Structures are given as C-alpha cells and as structure tokens.
Curated annotation (Swiss-Prot):
Principal location class: cytoplasm
Molecular function (Gene Ontology), one example: 3-deoxy-manno-octulosonate cytidylyltransferase activity
Lineage: Bacteria, Pseudomonadati, Campylobacterota, Epsilonproteobacteria, Nautiliales
Record bears the keyword Cell inner membrane: no
Listed EC numbers: 2.7.7.38
Protein name: 3-deoxy-manno-octulosonate cytidylyltransferase
Gene: kdsB
Role summary: Activates KDO (a required 8-carbon sugar) for incorporation into bacterial lipopolysaccharide in Gram-negative bacteria.
PANTHER family for this protein: 3-DEOXY-MANNO-OCTULOSONATE CYTIDYLYLTRANSFERASE, 3-DEOXY-MANNO-OCTULOSONATE CYTIDYLYLTRANSFERASE, MITOCHONDRIAL
Compartmental location: Cytoplasm
Keywords from the named record: Cytoplasm, Lipopolysaccharide biosynthesis, Nucleotidyltransferase, Transferase
Species, as recorded: Nitratiruptor sp. (strain SB155-2)
Length: 238
C-alpha cells in the first residue's frame, strides 16, 4: 500500500498540496502517478483535502493536526486502516508531483527484499547529479557504503571535495517499510543529528538501524517553495 501524507498548513508554502498544476491539485498528480504501482491512501489533517481526494476517486483518512512529521502521519493512518504488521507501506511525499511510478516500484521491490531483516529499518532511493548543482540545502545528500546502505544524510555537500568530484547522491523523498518497522521508528527518541539537520531518517541511523538505498533515474523534484514550481515544465502534465 502507498500512503501519501498531506499536511495543509505547510510553513514555507501554505496549502501547497492543493496548489493547482494544469488545473489539478498537486497531491492528485502525485496520487495518480503512485496509483500506477499500488493502492493509494491519502493521510491528511484537512477535511478539505479529504473531500478533494474523494472527488478524484482516492481513499483518504483524517489524521491528527499535531504530527511533527509525515512519517508520524503515515503511522497513524496505517493504524486507522488496521494494516497487518508485515504489510509493506510506501510513503510517497505529497509534494512530488513528478514522481515516476518506476521509482516507487523500485523502492517497493527493495522493501520486499528486506522484509525479514531486523537491521534494515527502512528503504529509500537516490539519484546521481552533477556535484556543481548541489548547493541547495533542500536537496538532501546521502553517502553510501559498498552495499548501498546509507552512512549519512545531510543538507550540506557530502562528501567534502578535497579532490575532483563529478557527481553526488541526492536522496529522494520516498520511504518503504513494514508497518512493524514503521511503528518501531515512530517510538524511537528523536536524535540530536535529526534535530540539527531536520532530517528524520537520521533517527534510524543514530539508533543503530540501517537504511537500504536503491539508485534510480528520476526527473522528480520536491516542491518546497513557490519558486520550485517554476522548475516544473508544464508539458509533463499534458
């Protein structure tokens, strides 16, 4: 199952999940792409988002307004839906209207592969881009070990380029886990590194769990600010 967390009152871009792109709300673009891979449920704190989701034929559940992260919202939704402990859940960010179904599929396949692992808490994806294009702190960087497990995530440029570096790994905002591991993640204490970087995935690494990564090819960008919308080619939605 794919669960899309959708908070209406975004700090940097209020009501962004309902912002129209070619006349269709952003979250609906995301949901339509995700629905090519698996069943989609939208988890939101807004009756308005609930109504719009249903108008476009998507199931939605109403969750608390007090959640500090999308993962907490997904966790509540999974509980409300009564999902089994071993159910595979893919968390797709609402502000990824360009997310390719193939990216979601790869993360789902990786999550299934690690379902029985006690050390892999979650799975995610990354893409390689030019090192010169990584100054934006909203583009989260990830360094990996030899088996594509995450060593660290940062908003800074990592690794530091003491020598010539042509490409760097950019983390994509998608997560896969079992409901059991999702619940475990949400019960872990917030980590100091997580608070510094404002990256919740660092919580898993801090507490000794591992994050499995898969390389993908993707043109998707997360919409964090109104300026990000200018980067989107409207023809993608035609």
């Amino acid at each position: 199952m794919i669960i899309i967390p959708a908070r209406l009152a975004s700090t940097r871009f209020p009501r962004k999940v309902l912002h129209p792109i070619n006349g269709i709300p952003m979250i609906i673009h995301t949901a339509q792409r995700a629905s090519q891979v698996d069943e989609v449920v939208i988890a939101t704190d807004s009756e308005e988002v609930m109504k719009i989701a249903k108008q476009y034929g998507f199931d939605a559940v109403l969750t608390s307004k007090t959640h500090e992260s999308g993962t907490d919202r997904v966790n509540e939704a999974a509980t409300l839906l009564g999902l089994d402990a071993k159910e595979i859940i893919i968390n797709v960010q609402a502000d990824e209207p360009l997310i390719e179904p193939q990216v979601i599929k790869k993360v789902k396949e990786l999550t299934i592969k690690h379902t029985k692992s006690c050390e892999i808490m979650l799975c995610s994806a990354y893409k390689k881009i030019s090192f010169d294009a990584t100054n934006d702190p909203n583009s989260v960087k990830v360094v990996l070990d030899a088996s594509d497990k995450a060593l660290y995530f940062s908003r800074s440029q990592i690794p530091y380029p003491r020598s010539d570096v042509k490409t760097i790994n950019i983390h994509l905002g998608i997560y896969g886990y079992t409901k059991e591991m999702l619940q475990k993640f949400c019960t872990l204490p917030t980590a100091p590194l997580e608070q510094i970087e404002k990256l919740e995935q660092l919580r898993a690494l801090y507490h000794g769990y591992r994050i499995a990564m898969v390389e993908v090819t993707s043109q998707s960008i997360g919409i964090d600010t109104p300026e990000d919308l200018k980067k989107i080619n409207a023809s993608f939605f035609e």
